[in-house]
Design a protein with these regions (language model features):
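Glycine- and acidic-residue-enriched helix-capping/strand-helix junction motifs
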Residues: 1-9
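Flexible, glycine/proline-enriched loop segments at strand-loop-helix junctions
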Residues: 3-4, 81-84, 137-144
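N-terminal active-site beta-alpha-beta segment that forms phosphate/nucleotide-binding
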Residues: 9-95, 100-105
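N-terminal start-of-chain detector that recognizes signal peptides
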Residues: 1, 25-26, 76-79, 90-91, ...
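Conserved phosphate- and dinucleotide-binding cores of soluble alpha/beta proteins
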Residues: 98-217
């Protein structure tokens, strides 16, 4: 068999797709970030009539190239939470406004085989927007985010994704030195707000694109 790893993941991704659909998410499968990019631009955006777009911190979103492309689209109000030219106060206000965007795009820290999304935030703006506020949400998910069940998801987030992100962001937290969660009290702590999304409500509000690549942390 050619490309057995890709075939293995095709089977697993299909099963997760079915589980998410049973939980009222709309789900797409993409072979790579290029196809995920096209799904958003050609299949999702034209159906939404969105006038404002924002996003939450996501390496997977950046990997698709959508960040740069969407910013150039005419007729869209862009609430750019990644704009480093803004002051901290201005960026916080953009994040507040993003909660009411027509479309919010982000990633997820983990997704279970049973079709549950698990996220842990520093500020809570991403976790909030996934679950309430924006009219539509698109979540881009690399295959490496799939775990068996909820306990595995929380372990993955606390002891892999969060320490790795703290290192990436050069935070002054104990996990940067130990590589696992110390349940710290540091002012730099990025683990403050958990959300567990068992269902999309209303049905189809959250669209998930499962990508057959390892992406993000």
């Amino acid at each position: 068999m050619d490309k057995p790893i890709e075939h293995y993941w095709q089977i697993r991704l299909k099963a997760v797709k079915e589980a998410l659909e049973a939980n009222h998410f709309e789900v797409f499968l993409a072979k790579d970030v290029g196809e995920a990019n096209k799904i958003v631009k050609d299949q999702i955006l034209p159906t939404l009539g969105a006038k404002s777009v924002s996003w939450g911190g996501s390496m997977t979103f950046l990997a698709t190239g959508l960040y740069e492309e969407i910013k150039k689209m005419p007729g869209l109000e862009i609430l750019d939470t990644f704009d480093r030219s803004k002051s901290p106060e201005e960026n916080m206000e953009i994040r507040r406004r993003a909660v009411l965007a027509d479309l919010f795009i982000t990633g997820t820290n983990a997704v279970t085989e049973g079709g549950i999304l698990v996220n842990l935030d520093m500020l809570g703006n991403r976790a909030c927007s996934i679950n309430f506020g924006p009219k539509h949400v698109v979540i881009l998910v690399g295959r490496n985010k799939i775990v068996s069940e909820l306990d595995d998801a929380m372990y993955r987030v606390k002891n892999y994704a969060a320490p790795a992100n703290a290192m990436r962001l050069e935070k002054k937290t104990p996990c940067v030195k130990t590589s696992y969660c110390e349940d710290c009290k540091s002012p730099d702590r990025i683990c403050n707000v958990w959300t567990i999304t068992e269902k999309s409500f209303p049905k189809g509000r959250i669209r998930v694109i499962l990508i057959n690549q390892d992406l993000g942390l």
